[in-house]
Amino acid sequence: MNEIVDFVDEEAGSDSLFDCEYTSVDAIINQVTVFTGAKAQQTENGERCLIAYGEGYNRSAFFTDSKKLKDVVLAPNRQFPFRAIIKVVNYGTMMGFKFFAPNAPITDDKANFEAYKRTKGRGYRR
């Protein structure tokens, strides 16, 4: 008779962070947010970063391709949870996202966010 072995969950609880409704990053731009975890995940659009935020019934997650956001949350020494603000920033003619300290003032970022929303969905044009 074969020996029966107990199942061992190798990623104990880590996926429960992502067992929630997913939103767009737009939902939390310019708001102080508690980020609870992140992981790189293979999707039909290639490898993307999934970032979880919020707690309890308010928890959610979003996918991002932003290099600035991925570099922060996927850093080997990153500790979760942490509080931060995601702001829209200008990089020359391009727009992107960046983490800021939770006490950072929200000034002209509203104008950047409005410009981002107007250009969202349009491809890069030469």
For each feature predicted by the language model, list its residue ranges.
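Short nucleic-acid-contacting surface segments enriched for D/E, G, S/T with interspersed K/R
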Residues: D26-I29, K68-K87
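Eukaryotic short linear interaction motifs
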Residues: Q42-T43, R59, K70-D71, T93-M95, ...
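Short, surface-exposed, charged amphipathic helix/loop patches that serve as local interaction elements
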Residues: G46-G56, I85-T93, K98
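A short macromolecule-binding patch
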Residues: N58-T64
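OB-fold ssDNA-binding interfaces and closely related basic DNA-contact patches used
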Residues: M1-G56
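OB-fold/S1-family single-stranded nucleic acid-binding modules
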Residues: K87-Y124
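Positively charged, low-complexity intrinsically disordered regions
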Residues: S60, Q79, T119, G123-R126
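Exposed alpha-helical structural elements
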Residues: E3, K67-K68
